[in-house]
Amino acid sequence: MAHFPGFGQSLLYGYPVYVFGDCVQADWCPISGGLCSARLHRHALLATCPEHQITWDPIDGRVVSSALQYLIPRLPSFPTQRTTRTLKVLTPPTTAATPKIPPSFFHAVKKHTPFRNNCLELTLGEQLPAMSFPDPGLRPQNIYTMWGSSVVCLYLYQLSPPMTWPLIPHVIFCHPEQLGAFLTRVPTKRLEELLYKIFLSTGAIIILPENCFPTTLFQPTRAPAVQAPWHTGLLPCQKEIATPGLIWTFTDGSPMISGPCPKEGQPSLVVQSSTFIFQQFQTKASHPAFLLSHKLIHYSSFHSLHLLFEEYTTIPFSLLFNEKGANVDDDEPRDGSQPPARGQIAESPV
């Protein structure tokens, strides 16, 4: 029986989806990043792309049938995301080849370029406007770039994203050597595989330095390196920890990235962006609830959680929303201990 336009229910998983006529409205092919199939299967609510011979679940992005199935990353689908408001599978509007980005964005980039060795360096802010943006039909949301030895997410702008890939941007600035410094004990081939997965899954434009490792997997966009490799960043270097960080977004659009876990199952959050926030939190790692209580991050930004690898899927999602983990008096040293030295990261209890 045909569905009426409006909200329906997934026959596979039971949570609500948006239904358009007989079928769910069109979705985005995770290989090309564009609109390849105008219709989805009505009963199973699965998206298909005849051109690439791929079928996937539009809710969590899980590939059901594809010759490239082993290359498509599996993104987690948290229960908190399954609401009638967030599970609309809609076609986002196409954008112009050169999006109209407000000048205030570039001004903020220059103004809030993070500290390096206690100095502000404006190279990122000066070169960013000259970079190219995605082709029409893609959905740019964030820009990844390298600050220090950290992978940082710059909030750009957000359209109405489909639910297939709501967590991954479409313009990625990546310096493999810095990425390797941040993701400890990750071989070069693994980093190349990671970029290839993102490329296949999202159709993202990946911008690499001109002289970085040549790859036979895909042809990334080449651009002059924004920064040379810088291996002594703010993130604590712990050789015994190989898990990556998590990327968040502040309410003012400033990015924040987490460091390695100080304890098992506990993310250690380290700020990498605006001058004010950097000065406030540069000497300690804060729980998300602490930053949330100070109105520094949106609650909805937790839904923009980005997982580079699958190790963090073991962290209970409820832990990230545990208000009891926030310590408002974290500035005060406890038990007579001295506060950490400048540039060091202290672990905050969760």
Curated annotation (Swiss-Prot):
Which residues are recorded as modified (Phosphoserine)?
S300, S301
Q: Name one Pfam family in it.
A: Tax
Region span, Disordered: 326-350
Q: Which GO terms describe its cellular component?
A: host cell cytoplasm; host cell nucleus
Q: Where is this region: Interaction with CREB1?
A: 1-58
Keyword ATP-binding among UniProt keywords = no
Q: Region Transactivation: what ranges?
A: 289-322
State the compartments where it is located. Answer: Host nucleus; Host cytoplasm
Please report, in chain numbering, the residue ranges of the motif PDZ-binding. Answer: 347-350
Q: Note down the stretches annotated as region Interaction with CREBBP C-terminus.
A: 312-319
GO biological process assignments: positive regulation of DNA-templated transcription; symbiont-mediated perturbation of host cell cycle G0/G1 transition checkpoint; symbiont-mediated perturbation of host cell cycle progression
- Region labeled Homodimerization — which residues? 116-145, 213-248
Place the motif Nuclear export signal on the sequence: 188-202
Where does each unnamed zinc finger lie? 23-49
Record PTM text = Phosphorylation at Thr-48 results in the loss of NF-kappa-B activation function. Phosphorylation at Thr-215 results in loss of CREB and NF-B responsive promoters activation. Phosphorylation at Thr-184 has no effect on these functions. Phosphorylation of either Ser-300 or Ser-301 is necessary for localization to nuclear bodies. Thr-48, Thr-184 and Thr-215 are highly phosphorylated, whereas Ser-300 or Ser-301 are only rarely phosphorylated.
Renumbered to this chain, motif SH3-binding spans: 73-80
Any one Gene Ontology MF annotation carried by this entry is: DNA binding
Residues of the signal peptide = none
Q: How does it assemble?
A: Homodimer. Interacts with host CREB1, CREBBP and EP300.
Q: What family is reported?
A: Belongs to the deltaretrovirus Tax protein family.
Relate the protein's function as given in its record: Transcriptional activator that activates both the viral long terminal repeat (LTR) and cellular promoters via activation of CREB, NF-kappa-B, SRF and AP-1 pathways. Binds to two 21 bp repeat elements located within the LTRs, referred to as Tax-responsive element (TRE). Binding to TRE requires the interaction with CREB1 and CREBBP. Activation of NF-kappa-B leads to up-regulation of the expression of gene promoters containing NFkB motifs like IL8 or BCL2L1. Inhibits the action of p53/TP53 and MYCB. All these functions could lead to the possible occurrence of lymphoproliferative disorders.
Relay the domain remarks.
The 48 N-terminal residues contain a non-canonical functional nuclear localization signal (NLS). The PDZ-binding domain may mediate binding to PDZ-containing proteins and could be a factor of pathogenicity.
The protein here is known as Protein Tax-3
Q: What is the organism lineage in this UniProt record? A: Viruses, Riboviria, Pararnavirae, Artverviricota, Revtraviricetes
